[in-house]
Amino acid sequence: MKIAIGCDHIVTNEKMAVSDFLKSKGYEVLDFGTYDHTRTHYPIFGKKVGEAVVSGQADLGVCICGTGVGINNAVNKVPGVRSALVRDMTSALYAKEELNANVIGFGGKITGELLICDIIEAFIHAEYKPTEENKKLIAKIEHVETHNAHQADDNFFTEFLEKWDRGEYHD
């Protein structure tokens, strides 16, 4: 199984620990960054993870930022992604079994590393239960998706990053 993973600069260490855990369990990890602590932007990495999952390059995705809120919002903008921001086992299992979530999000500064790893392992092993009710819920979720032609542009974030480099945005 291939698992895509991405994070922002705030939780690079946590992402690397999760990546190492997944590799120790025999999973192939596709690491979409970031790879250091240089200030960066979580939407970039959420988008990359989401695209890898939707394209079939990865089977599942894991997104981590400080609280998990930002990167999870970003990955959920990729059409075809159903990501759940979780902090507990119950939410993660519900997301996979009932809503067929294909990405799971965490706040690396909110949820401990060992718990994150336990939740991910349970999420991987959980199976979607395709009941009529669950299918209808997923169809309703998919119905509100919007497709933005600009999302497919490889330079989607270029203007934003150039402005950042010029000092037009600040933390």
From Swiss-Prot:
Keywords: Isomerase, Lactose metabolism. GO terms for molecular function: galactose-6-phosphate isomerase activity; ribose-5-phosphate isomerase activity. Pathway: Carbohydrate metabolism; D-galactose 6-phosphate degradation; D-tagatose 6-phosphate from D-galactose 6-phosphate: step 1/1. Pfam families: LacAB_rpiB. Gene3D superfamilies: Sugar-phosphate isomerase, RpiB/LacA/LacB (3.40.1400.10). InterPro entries: LacB, RpiB_LacA_LacB, RpiB_LacA_LacB_sf. GO terms for biological process: D-allose catabolic process; galactose catabolic process; lactose catabolic process via tagatose-6-phosphate; pentose-phosphate shunt, non-oxidative branch. It catalyses: aldehydo-D-galactose 6-phosphate = keto-D-tagatose 6-phosphate. Its EC number is 5.3.1.26. SUPFAM superfamilies: Ribose/Galactose isomerase RpiB/AlsB. It is an enzyme of class 5 (isomerase). NCBIfam families: lacB, PRK05571.1, PRK08622.1, PRK12615.1, rpiB_lacA_lacB. PANTHER family: DNA DAMAGE-REPAIR_TOLERATION PROTEIN DRT102, RIBOSE-5-PHOSPHATE ISOMERASE B. Heteromultimeric protein consisting of LacA and LacB. Belongs to the LacAB/RpiB family. This is Galactose-6-phosphate isomerase subunit LacB. It comes from Streptococcus sanguinis (strain SK36).
